Amino acid sequence: MLSQNPTTVAWWSVRMRATGTLDDEPYHVSGAESLVAPGMIEQTVAGLTQRALAPGHTVKARQVRVSLDQLDVEPTIIPALPTELKECPDPVAARQYFVDVLSRFVPHPAEALRVLTEGPTMRGAAMVEAGTDRRLEADPLRGVRVTKFGDLTESAPGASLAHKKHHHEAVLLASKVAAAPGVLAEFCISDDPHYTRGYVCVDGVYTTVTNVKADGDPNGGRVILVDTARADPTTITTWLENHPVLIGPATASSQKATSWHGHLCGRLNAWRAAGLERRPRTFCSAQDPDAVTTDGPALLFSSSDYLGLSTEPKVQQAMNNTVRRLGSSSGGSRLTTGTSVAHHQAEHEIAAWLGYPQAVFMASGYQANIATIQLLADPHVTVISDAENHASLIDGCRLARARTVVVPHADLDAIDTALDCVTTDRALVLTEGVYSMGGDVAPVGELVEIAHRHGALVVVDDAHGIGTVGPTGRGATEELPASQRPDVLLGTASKALGVEGGFACVDETLATLMRNCARGYVFSSAPSPVVAAGVAAAVEYLRTDTRRVCSLQANVAQARLLLAEADLIPPSAAHDRGPIIRIPVGPESRAVAAQEELARRGLMVGAIRYPAVARGDAILRICLTARHTDEHIRILVTSLREVLDGALSDAPR
């Protein structure tokens, strides 16, 4: 271990490059670098020279150059990354692991992997922009070099450098890369034909991956994923190539608790660097258009209280009466003490209103979706799932371990083709009624006909359609004949109904099965009877009074027309009926900048980013309500046009 204070030593960079010839062309044989104190220069030069001339290289060195450069700035001292091991049985499994990790950052992970395995040989690394797959290095044949780094823990660098230590040297290099501004992750496959390991550096942890290639394979490379909103490519390159760094011992390699902390901090930092961090806004008022938060007044265009029923006196009175009569808690699951007369009333009202024999009421729409799909699907079921389905539907498929086929959004031909190819015992088609990110209405009737022709079950999640579309607000299926209605209709009470909870509308057989076997129903505490009473009152209100539904639909039509005229949405979206309006923005950083500028103008609009939408396809998500006025909508359209045209013209793209 060095005894000198590293911040008071005049450090030197000692670099070695050895070249030979192969097929009459120059060939790189070996290269290494170390930062050393003056007293260690001689032994370092000797060690690097010994490495260059050592037998075993593919090509014999014909020229060895050793250069010495005194640093003009003090090196930064950082700890080495904690290390882990990912054992893979073969290159196929190892490369799938690379693809799985890459998919967190780039839309086409297989393309990024090809840079590692099939790209032209270069001594540096490829710099790839997260979210776009765009290559950023100035010279793709040279790549980005990582230089001017050394090992602060090495007591005899000359002897150490005489023989290459792949793992140790890779950890040092990766530690410097991970500390660079804007870097999210690094991936490496060694180009040494006889070194069959690679590494992934992400979330502040260096993971060695075994069997990334066959012995004798000379191909390899490195990819550094960066966030250009955090640092531009020139800044990142300059830091990697010129900023001196000394790497000390890992602070967490042998302490599990510290390792966990570092791992979690790394994940959080990577999430932040990708522009994905969110913070909740705290409300001091109800979800009215003219809302009040702890940051001040806000014109609200991001609430799902579409009809304003959360402040409807009849709903509130029903809840007040119930809390006095039945208490504030259910006290248990639905099969123990958690079912009250209020729960039965809510289920009866929902089923009668939406035209199904039974409704099964649960604590949230998310829970109802997962519980229903987990019950229906299993490894013997193929689920045909729309590409824009909500996370709760996706999670339900994962928990069920069903074979899931994702089809393009609202593509009936793709659904038909997928059903033709089903080889499992049963099939299930899964879609939303009104899509939660775009507000478009699914072609449910035609979809049901196709699915039933193949003997498949149809499940429709109409969380954003119930209460908002249809002549009387009964959702995307209201006008369909019985032959075109889905087998299972999922919904929520937390949006248009203005309360809480979720439900599945089903037949008698499935209702009984769910009440006995659906895990989200059996093993979760029941929603409060107060909530159930509010849901029953909200449904009863809508059965007898549709004026709020009409007001909402008029606002949606007006807003879509004005937004299309302002070129903020495509003409095709002007005629969609859903209360959610998708404003395409692009990069996450631009969506956040737009959201912040709108907030400064007093408007609260959601910036929807990965993982709710694809990386690089962020949107502003407008939610209309029955209580918005013509003036509110005019302010919205004008502000959006000004912000997206003017205030963000210089925002990162």
Swiss-Prot record:
Cofactor(s) recorded in Swiss-Prot or TrEMBL: Mg(2+); pyridoxal 5'-phosphate
A Pfam family matched in the record: Aminotran_1_2
Pathway of action: Metabolic intermediate metabolism; pimeloyl-CoA biosynthesis; pimeloyl-CoA from pimelate: step 1/1; Cofactor biosynthesis; biotin biosynthesis
Modified-residue entries (N6-(pyridoxal phosphate)lysine), positions: K495
Record: residues binding pyridoxal 5'-phosphate: G365, Y366, S436, D461, D462, A463, H464, T492, A493, S494, K495
Domain of life of the native organism: Bacteria
Membrane-spanning segments: none
InterPro entries referenced in this protein's UniProt entry, alphabetically: Aminotransferase_I/II_large (IPR004839), AON_synthase_class-II (IPR050087), BioW (IPR005499), PyrdxlP-dep_Trfase (IPR015424), PyrdxlP-dep_Trfase_major (IPR015421), PyrdxlP-dep_Trfase_small (IPR015422)
GO molecular function: 6-carboxyhexanoate-CoA ligase activity; 8-amino-7-oxononanoate synthase activity; ATP binding; pyridoxal phosphate binding
Record GO biological process: biotin biosynthetic process
Catalytic reactions of this protein: heptanedioate + ATP + CoA = 6-carboxyhexanoyl-CoA + AMP + diphosphate; 6-carboxyhexanoyl-[ACP] + L-alanine + H(+) = (8S)-8-amino-7-oxononanoate + holo-[ACP] + CO2
Keyword RNA-binding among record annotations: no
EC number(s) recorded for this UniProt protein: 6.2.1.14, 2.3.1.47
Residues binding substrate, per UniProt: R278, H390
Assembly: Homodimer.
Family: In the N-terminal section; belongs to the BioW family. In the C-terminal section; belongs to the class-II pyridoxal-phosphate-dependent aminotransferase family. BioF subfamily.
PANTHER family: 8-AMINO-7-OXONONANOATE SYNTHASE (PTHR13693:SF100), CLASS II AMINOTRANSFERASE/8-AMINO-7-OXONONANOATE SYNTHASE (PTHR13693)
Main function: Catalyzes both the decarboxylative condensation of pimeloyl-[acyl-carrier protein] and L-alanine to produce 8-amino-7-oxononanoate (AON), [acyl-carrier protein], and carbon dioxide, and the transformation of pimelate into pimeloyl-CoA with concomitant hydrolysis of ATP to AMP.
Protein's name in the database: Biotin biosynthesis bifunctional protein BioWF
